């Protein structure tokens, strides 16, 4: 898979558009917890649509986390100059990059364990021939999965995905709040 920068920028723009269109909700006297639930069900779902297939660089993850924090601050009426920490702002919510990683891992596990499709070959496919151009290698899906799980190589990743209980624990560990 190729870099997902264009899709990420489109998702961010659509999420900002949705957030700004609901200004009357964010500025209302509604409870903060209710605003967060509404934010997650509307804006976050728009932002994370299709994120299971993204292979993000560290800079893109940082940009997404910052955008998400700014959006959450706007939704909860917490100004950036107020002395409210991100831990207080997020509360029990996990970081956005952890949510993306958990969704990515969940999809990869489903695809790998599907018996009828050759999706497991697609999930772990790496080119073995050809000439790579100059410069830094592009971030690919397998490397992203390895980074998310801490697996050393594709064989170790495959054994982790094959055991459903172990894989479920990897996914659940990503969703725990910091």
Regions found by a protein language model. Give the residues of each.
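Short linear motifs embedded in intrinsically disordered, charge-biased segments
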Residues: 1-178
